[in-house]
Amino acid sequence: MADEKNKPENPDLDQRDINNPRDREALKQAADDFLKARRAEARAEAAADEAEGEVDETANRIAVLEADNTELKDQMLRVAAEMENLRKRTQRDVQDARAYAITNFARDMLSVSDNLRRALDAIPADALEADSNLKSLSEGVEMTERAMLLALERHGVKKLEPEGQKFDPNFHQAMFEVPNPDLPNNTVVQVVQAGYAIGDRVLRPAMVGVSKGGPKVSAENGASTSEDNA
């Protein structure tokens, strides 16, 4: 295309006489035009190469930026996940602190309640009937015990009442066995000392007696199976 534009107006330059001034001028003009065309082509090729190099450099920069963006996004997601886990752990710790803050205090108060109950149980029934003052004192101590247990209950402490339930080592402590073929094996038949729990944690296991020699309860479906007496 550039060659066609730079062709001399007279196509038969090879037939011109170099000794003729006019022909010599025409040949010179044709040579100048040819050189200009070649220089223009060279500049165009150089510009194209430079543009291609700039495109490649831009593409490389874009690739680097995209990689950096992906890495930063991954870091941000990891930080967000860690912050969410930290928030959940903190919330759980706060809830546990609220629920179990009085654990040691409640355990000490249960010991006091046990002592009050032992004192009440140690008073003979005939002595209560014979002495009105002793009876009034006993009633006052019993009211104090009930008020103490109610106060603990308001703060999340609940009494375990396992009599008639299947023995659970997580909540009960077996003190003795009672032969009884009429009850499923390992049924709680007597509570020696009440147990207590706070939230989902055992504050004190219930001390119990369990049955022995009755039908065994299946762990899967609760069906009873016969079991020989030991």
Curated annotation (Swiss-Prot):
Predominant location: cytoplasm
Chaperone in keyword set: yes
GO process annotations (BP): protein folding
Compartment list: Cytoplasm
Comp. bias regions, Polar residues: 221-230
Annotated GO MF terms: adenyl-nucleotide exchange factor activity; protein homodimerization activity; protein-folding chaperone binding; unfolded protein binding
NCBIfam families: PRK14139.1 (NF010737), PRK14140.1 (NF010738), PRK14141.1 (NF010739), PRK14150.1 (NF010748)
Protein name: Protein GrpE
Originating species: Brucella canis (strain ATCC 23365 / NCTC 10854 / RM-666)
